[in-house]
């Protein structure tokens, strides 16, 4: 496989700055880099789009090495990605965000996956979190922006320190907000590369893989939860509803701020 750094030197683009870390004061971002070379996000995204899920994961492991991090949500797509990655390299870095509001079944899934793969997850939790759950349940925050920002987004920023590319399990079929998700691209939220290896997979393909490879998965999926987050803001979705209809049900919110 030809290294990305050999063929994708990037011309300047108005969305990015040419020199220096961080913003240049005009809202522009630093130019994306792989292996010390500035690269063209659109070109590299198009090339990785042509890869299959396992090939894309193998490419990312080879390209980013120890600067690659796999974010694990303990949902069905995480089970698939973990199995693929572990078969390629048993030493890849798996981490998760512990909001301390996850379902008991989610923590149990974490433990079963750790045993299945013989690994330890790196856990990230908000330092000294305020008592947010009671305020959320009391309806003080509307759609829960502050809770997600505190327990998820801020914690994710810490988790990504030292990471050049992170791996997510989002798919285009999840919701309208994810319909155009690339398999690989520059994540402007965190100023890092992001790989979505299962971007083009549907539920049937995910479940066939899990069953064929006998990978542990979250039992809440068998109880009407197509998407699983924190207990206070996750409910089952009715048949035929959007896969994320059970997240922040009754509100216009569909994302926590990490993926959208």
Question: Which residues are covered by each model-predicted region?
Answer:
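Nucleotide-activated chemistry modules centered on ATP-dependent adenylation/adenylyltransferase
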Residues: 2-260
């Amino acid at each position: 496989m030809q290294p990305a750094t050999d063929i994708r030197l990037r011309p300047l683009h108005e969305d990015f700055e040419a020199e220096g870390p961080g913003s240049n004061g005009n809202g522009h971002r630093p130019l994306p880099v792989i292996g010390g070379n500035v690269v063209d996000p659109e070109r590299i995204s198009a090339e990785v789009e042509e890869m299959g899920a396992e090939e894309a994961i193998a490419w990312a492991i080879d390209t980013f090495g120890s600067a690659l991090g796999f974010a694990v949500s303990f949902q069905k797509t995480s089970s698939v990605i973990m199995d693929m990655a572990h078969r390629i390299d048993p030493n890849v870095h798996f981490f998760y965000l512990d909001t301390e509001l996850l379902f008991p079944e989610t923590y149990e899934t974490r433990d079963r996956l750790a045993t299945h793969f013989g690994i330890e997850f790196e856990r990230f939790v908000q330092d000294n979190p305020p008592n947010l759950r009671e305020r959320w349940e009391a309806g003080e925050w509307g759609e829960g922006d502050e809770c997600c920002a505190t327990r998820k987004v801020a914690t994710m920023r810490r988790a990504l320190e030292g990471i050049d590319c992170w791996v997510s399990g989002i798919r285009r079929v999840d919701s309208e907000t994810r319909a155009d998700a690339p398999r690989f691209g520059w994540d402007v939220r965190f100023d890092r590369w992001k790989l979505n290896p299962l971007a083009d997979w549907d539920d049937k393909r995910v479940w066939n893989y899990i069953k064929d490879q006998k990978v542990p998965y979250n039992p809440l999926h068998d109880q009407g939860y197509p998407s699983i987050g924190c207990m206070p803001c996750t409910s089952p979705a009715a048949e035929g509803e959007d896969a994320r209809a059970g997240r922040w049900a009754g509100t216009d919110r569909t994302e926590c701020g990490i993926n959208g």
